[in-house]
């Protein structure tokens, strides 16, 4: 069963077309109206009044557009949760522009990971992080605005209907990847720390863990923090802090204030390193204020800037402040011979003074805390270091006091 979620006053014809397309494929459809202006142009299964009541507001009281979008998003989220709990939602599809994209994706993000969610939007180009957040939501660019059925929109919407029909059928049949019973470990990685994290992942897998690797792209860090906060992880191997240095320099791909603190607050055992704190990430170019710095083109979409000694010291203080309150067993590994593939002897970002400022700030900031510091005379990508970190996390997770809890 597929839920069609949207504003049936402004996009009624498009939703009616999608409903008929899905029904022609034998798909049962629930049409949910989130409009607040004119009368719906197609009869919904869940009217806007029911959505408004789910948000705790009186139907017809929403005159301000911004307040209406916020309230209806809240109500739609409750409706989607209920339909999913009742077994009447195996996938959800929405179409629209900026307003409906904001409303519908907010509601979709209330559903668990694994439930098919598809948004066809004229906004699905550029920075889509406000819509996706830390969910598994899928975005499809509409090419033309969602305003009537024409030869372009018909093909795009047909593809969307066929896609959600297939995803919903798979979800309803119970064909997702089987859930395992191995403990989940969250690890962080970027291209410049891949070799070391891969070695740690292989070792943890051999030790009986299922490892979820989060790309340190901003969205990846938010997902990592959310899963840690939700109690989904048994422990973390947080080897890559690119999002932290990127936030410090105002770059592209920030993970938010919970990036370092979520696992601490959740009381998770952690083994941590400082991979990629030698750089901050930007887009295809860097701001004018940084163009005199050591800039490296990673690929056509990503440019990085080397962090200075002063910035590394500030980053060390920030990381130490976030970790200081850890009550669960926590270990911090300092790779004295480099923080990334670029920051190694002979590498373009090799800077012992800057790295030393980072290490000194961490040592000072964590003095007297429960965080154990281990120093390694190698770089962060050394497979031996990755395996040592994995073994250390395994020891923390299987310690008698932990195993008994």
Give short role names for the model-derived ranges.
Residues 11-20, 30, 34-46, 180-218, ...:
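Glycine-rich phosphate/diphosphate-binding loop of Rossmann-like nucleotide-binding domains
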Residues 94-113, 197-201, 345-351, 359:
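Short Gly/Thr/Asp-enriched flexible loops that form oxyanion-binding sites at enzyme active sites
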Residues 3, 10-16, 21-24, 28-29, ...:
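C-terminal non-catalytic interaction/assembly regions of soluble proteins
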Residues 112-114, 118-167, 287-291, 302-318:
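Short, glycine-/small-residue-rich phosphate/pyrophosphate-handling segment
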Residues 7-13, 90-104, 186-197, 217-219, ...:
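Gly/Ser/Thr-rich loops at beta-strand to alpha-helix junctions
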Residues 91, 103-132, 141, 212-216, ...:
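Short, acidic/small-residue loops that bind anionic groups at enzyme active sites
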Residues 209-272:
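A conserved active-site cap/scaffold subdomain adjacent to cofactor or substrate pockets
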Residues 5-70, 121-129, 141-162, 167:
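N-terminal glycine-rich anion-binding loop in soluble enzyme alpha/beta folds
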